[in-house]
């Protein structure tokens, strides 16, 4: 299993991307990594960690990097040798099995589209983010690839999300919900209203109707379907809420009496367990579903821990043949069966 890493992507590259790759290789004997980017910088980090001669770690030179503030389309046209582009080409040319792309989400999506192409029947790929809930994990998609979706895009997302949830959650018939401002089928904007009856009439997904934002942390369904604008707002709010609540608890304890501090010590193990369960860094990243290859988008602020996890998830998705499952699903039903352009 060989994974291509955009070693120059993200706020802490290349240090954290390289360290995370080292950790993944050390922990998984079947994984090899190809670090794409500035050879000298990458080699220096490998050498400092006694991994410069590891046969399962190689370096592939890329002379350019796409920054977080650059326009994705323009950057890809100007920077043909950008690390994310080169990493994607390694999968396209069958030299690697998957890509890990921290950094600019827009650039990553564009690189995947141009480099790998779309699966037949998919108009737009979606980012499928695992969301921690009280009952486990819920897959939310789209969480940032497309800000203006049509009903057909949401339908395609529901199909891909259902297949992903089967692999991720191990559920034979995962439940699917459409994110809306109310549970009634008559509520919502034009896109959601048009999407509802299509999902309701499909036999290959277990559609449970509309859900509201408050239902997500409850784990009401296994798959939450929404457009990328709404999904990204929900995702960022959830990340900020966990951080804010954690700080609020700490501040309250420090400002409390000696009895409050003693009580905090007693519940500390439970609080740490809860914090770990809600920590988005535990998930590593999110797959971009709908392109012809396993493509993991990692958080721009990813540290070594998240990179390692993203690599392991990517390896698992390749082994479980997620791309093949999506192709088969799109051939059976879904966007190929319905004649709609709205």
Model segments located where?
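Glycine-rich phosphate/nucleotide-binding loop
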Residues: 113-126, 132-140, 220-224, 228-340
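Phosphate/nucleotide-donor binding subsite
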Residues: 50-96
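Short glycine/serine/threonine-rich phosphate/pyrophosphate-binding segments
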Residues: 13-17, 42, 80-94, 98-112, ...
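Short beta-strand segments
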Residues: 6, 35-37, 60, 101-103, ...
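N-terminal phosphate-binding or glycine-rich loops at protein starts, especially the Walker A/P-loop
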Residues: 1-43
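Glycine-rich phosphate/diphosphate-binding loop of Rossmann-like nucleotide-binding domains
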Residues: 15-16, 28-34, 40, 147-209, ...
């Amino acid at each position: 299993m060989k994974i291509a890493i955009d070693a120059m992507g993200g706020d802490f590259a290349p240090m954290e991307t390289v360290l995370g790759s080292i950790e993944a290789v050390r922990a998984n004997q079947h994984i090899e990594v190809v670090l794409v980017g500035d050879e000298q910088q990458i080699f220096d980090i490998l050498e400092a960690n006694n991994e410069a001669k590891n046969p399962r770690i190689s370096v592939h030179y890329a002379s350019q990097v796409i920054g977080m503030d650059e326009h994705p389309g323009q950057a890809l046209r100007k920077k043909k040798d950008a690390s994310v582009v080169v990493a994607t080409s390694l999968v396209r040319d069958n030299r690697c099995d998957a890509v890990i792309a921290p950094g600019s989400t827009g650039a990553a999506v564009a690189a995947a589209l141009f480099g790998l192409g779309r699966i037949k029947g998919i108009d737009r790929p979606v980012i499928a983010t695992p969301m921690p809930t009280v009952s486990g994990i819920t897959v939310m998609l789209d969480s940032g690839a497309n800000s203006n979706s049509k009903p057909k895009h949401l339908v395609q997302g529901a199909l891909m999300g259902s297949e992903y949830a089967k692999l991720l959650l191990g559920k034979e018939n995962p439940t699917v919900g459409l994110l809306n401002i109310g549970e009634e089928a008559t509520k919502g904007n034009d896109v959601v209203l048009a999407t509802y009856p299509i999902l309701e009439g499909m036999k290959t997904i277990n559609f449970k109707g509309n859900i509201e934002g408050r239902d997500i942390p409850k784990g009401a369904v296994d798959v939450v379907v929404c457009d990328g604008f709404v999904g990204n707002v929900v995702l960022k709010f959830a990340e900020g809420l966990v951080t804010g609540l954690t700080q609020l608890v700490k501040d309250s304890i420090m400002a409390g009496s000696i009895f409050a501090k003693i009580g905090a010590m007693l519940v500390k193990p439970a609080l740490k367990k809860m914090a770990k369960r809600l920590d988005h860094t535990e998930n590593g990243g999110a797959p971009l579903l709908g392109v012809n290859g396993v493509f993991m988008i990692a958080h721009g602020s990813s540290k070594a821990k998240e990179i390692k996890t993203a690599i392991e998830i990517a390896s698992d998705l390749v082994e479980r043949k997620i791309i093949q499952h999506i192709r088969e699903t799109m051939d059976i039903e879904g966007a190929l069966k319905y004649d709609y352009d709205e």
